[in-house]
């Protein structure tokens, strides 16, 4: 589980996702938002993915603030647009859950903080998750990352 916070702007962050993450992270982001619904007993919970990784830092971050959830939903929406632009079809998680996950599951209004840096320490940058995730992409993910679709 992770949230690739490659830009504070969800549209730009989605565009920066490599091809492999353009598909894989559609599922992970839907899982994170589904967990928020399930853990808050949202009326939409039964339509979501099953609860997974409830104590992962990214899951905790997603459900800790309505602003976090909203930002992640916008990233997921933009990543769906990016997936469609690259592949010419909609991702299955978008088709299945877009009408459910668009509802914020009554989370606290705690404001916005950057997502946790879930990566090896060598890439972390205190107080700057964007730079940390870009470092992580250029370092740890460079061996498979491509933008060919």
What do these predicted regions represent?
Residues 1-91:
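An N-terminal structural lobe/cap that precedes and organizes the functional/catalytic core
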Residues 60, 93, 146-148:
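Residues in intrinsically disordered, low-complexity segments of regulatory proteins
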Residues 95-102:
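A glycine-rich phosphate-binding loop feature that marks nucleotide/adenosyl-phosphate handling sites
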Residues 103-149:
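Aromatic-residue-lined binding/catalytic grooves and analogous aromatic/hydrophobic interfacial grooves
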């Amino acid at each position: 589980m992770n949230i690739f916070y490659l830009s504070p702007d969800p549209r730009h962050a989605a565009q920066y996702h490599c091809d492999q993450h353009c598909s894989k992270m559609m599922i992970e982001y839907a899982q994170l938002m589904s967990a928020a619904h399930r853990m808050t007993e949202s009326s939409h919970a039964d339509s979501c993915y099953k609860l997974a990784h409830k104590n992962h830092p990214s899951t905790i971050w997603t459900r800790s603030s309505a602003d976090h959830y909203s930002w992640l939903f916008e990233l997921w929406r933009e990543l769906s647009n990016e997936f469609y632009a690259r592949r010419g079809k909609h991702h299955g998680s978008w088709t299945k859950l877009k009408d459910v996950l668009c509802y914020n599951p009554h989370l606290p209004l705690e404001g916005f903080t950057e997502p946790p840096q879930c990566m090896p320490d060598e890439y972390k940058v205190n107080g700057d998750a964007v730079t940390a995730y870009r470092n992580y992409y250029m370092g740890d993910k460079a061996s498979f990352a491509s933008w060919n679709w």
